[in-house]
Design a protein with these regions (language model features):
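A short beta-strand motif characteristic of beta-propeller blades
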Residues: 1, 35-41, 87-95, 128-138, ...
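Structural recognition of the beta-propeller blade-terminating site
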Residues: 31, 82, 123-125, 169-172
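A short loop-to-beta-strand structural motif that recurs across blades of beta-propeller domains
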Residues: 26-29, 76-79, 118-120, 167-169
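Blade-level signature of beta-propeller repeat domains, shared across WD40, Kelch, NHL, RCC1
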Residues: 167-193
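Short glycine/acidic-enriched loop and turn motifs that connect beta-strands
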Residues: 22-25, 64-69, 118-120, 160-164
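Short coil/turn segments that connect the beta-strands within blades of beta-propeller domains
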Residues: 13-14, 55-57, 108-110, 150-152
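Residue position within the beta-strands of beta-propeller blades
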Residues: 18, 59-62, 113-115, 156
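Repeated scaffold domains used in trafficking and secretory/extracellular systems
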Residues: 4-11, 45-53, 97-107, 139-147, ...
Length: 193
């Protein structure tokens, strides 16, 4: 089976789910006892992130491709997928031309965050996306995002111009800027112990 490039994985029971990102539109279900793909789910073009919330719902956001792409161009979307049934429960459309990415969860698994120019946040139980962002765009190149599992602080990576040292901004869960510091070039991922 051709998978293209894969991006992220989450586990539910004996299954691992992985999103196929580059020029793909699938999430694969892999049985960890046999290491075989046992199912696949079609979503929008280029699912960029994959997380599992407190209700055992998976979330992915699709990039939608780009104008002129041989693979296609469509509205990006945020998907809520039931891990037990491996079915799409809810689809939240994003505007054509937007570039959403970096779906993350807080430590409790009940608040979802993502980048779409601004930083957005919503409850995993919400039935619609918010109308106002959690953090407004600051004339930056938001490139990475994470939420501290211990205290809920939100860390945003800024690639600046993709040539110089990047910047990390740390906000409280209420959106108050508490720290900023330089890091290496093009910061794009975080890891928690």
């Amino acid at each position: 089976m051709e998978t293209g490039s894969t991006e992220q994985m989450v586990q539910y029971g004996k299954y691992v789910y992985v999103n196929c990102w580059s020029y793909q539109n699938r999430i694969l279900k892999i049985d960890t006892t046999t290491d075989k793909v046992v199912d696949q789910l079609t979503v929008g073009i280029q699912p960029t992130s994959l997380v599992m919330d407190k209700n055992f719902k998976m979330w992915t956001i699709t990039a939608g491709g780009y104008k002129g792409s041989p693979y296609g161009y469509e509205e990006p979307s945020l998907y809520r997928i039931d891990a037990e049934t491996f079915k799409i429960e809810k689809l939240f459309k994003v505007l054509l031309g937007d570039a959403p990415s970096e779906v993350q969860l807080n430590g409790a698994g009940d608040e979802l965050y993502w980048i779409n120019k601004d930083i957005w946040r919503m409850s995993v139980d919400a039935e619609r996306v918010p109308v106002r962002p959690f953090l407004k765009y600051r004339d930056t190149k938001y490139y990475g995002l994470t939420v501290s599992p211990k205290n809920g602080d939100v860390y945003v990576a800024d690639a600046i111009d993709y040539q110089q040292q990047g910047m990390i901004y740390r906000y409280t869960e209420d959106g108050e800027l508490v720290d900023e510091f330089y890091v290496g070039i093009i910061p794009g991922a975080f890891c928690w112990k």
